[in-house]
C-alpha cells in the first residue's frame, strides 16, 4: 500500500510569468526567456528569474555601491543590476563604469556618462554580451526598506529592536515617560 505524500512542501515556488503591465519589461522577459533556453548560460537564467521578481525584490542600487564593488580586479567587466541605479551625492567623483540596468535615474545616468562610462539597457546589453560572460551581477539590499524596521519581536519586549507603528509624533502619542536630568 502506497503513502499519499503531501505536495504542499514539494511544489516549486517562485514566479513563472510576468505580472507587470509594462510592455518594455514584457519584451525583456521574452528576450531573456529565449536566451536562457538557447544559450547554455546560467547568467541568462538568473537574469530571467530576477526580471520576473516583484518590485520590492528588485531593490535600487546606488552608484557608490557599484563603484565600490567594481574597483581594482573587475576593471574590464560590465556591472549588471536587475533594478534601478540611483545617484549617491556622497560619492564625490564617479569612476569610469559600464553599467547595465533596468532603469537609471537622470542624475545617475548623467554622472556615469560624464565620467566616460556607459549606461546600457538590457536589450543593448544582450547584443554586446548574449551569454553574459565577463560581467558582474549586482543586487540591492532587499531588507533596506523602512517597513523591515517594524518587523521582529514586538516593540517594548526585552531584546526587541522593532519600531512601533505610531499614528503621530506629537506629545500625546505613544511616548514613554522620560526622566528629565
Swiss-Prot record:
<dbReference type="InterPro" id="IPR000039">
    <property type="entry name" value="Ribosomal_eL18"/>
</dbReference>
<dbReference type="GO" id="GO:0003723">
    <property type="term" value="F:RNA binding"/>
</dbReference>
<dbReference type="GO" id="GO:0006412">
    <property type="term" value="P:translation"/>
</dbReference>
<keyword id="KW-0687">Ribonucleoprotein</keyword>
<dbReference type="InterPro" id="IPR036227">
    <property type="entry name" value="Ribosomal_uL15/eL18_sf"/>
</dbReference>
<comment type="similarity">
    <text>Belongs to the eukaryotic ribosomal protein eL18 family.</text>
</comment>
<dbReference type="InterPro" id="IPR021131">
    <property type="entry name" value="Ribosomal_uL15/eL18"/>
</dbReference>
<dbReference type="GO" id="GO:0003735">
    <property type="term" value="F:structural constituent of ribosome"/>
</dbReference>
<protein>
    <recommendedName>
        <fullName>Large ribosomal subunit protein eL18</fullName>
    </recommendedName>
</protein>
<dbReference type="Pfam" id="PF17135">
    <property type="entry name" value="Ribosomal_L18"/>
</dbReference>
<dbReference type="GO" id="GO:0022625">
    <property type="term" value="C:cytosolic large ribosomal subunit"/>
</dbReference>
<keyword id="KW-0689">Ribosomal protein</keyword>
<keyword id="KW-0963">Cytoplasm</keyword>
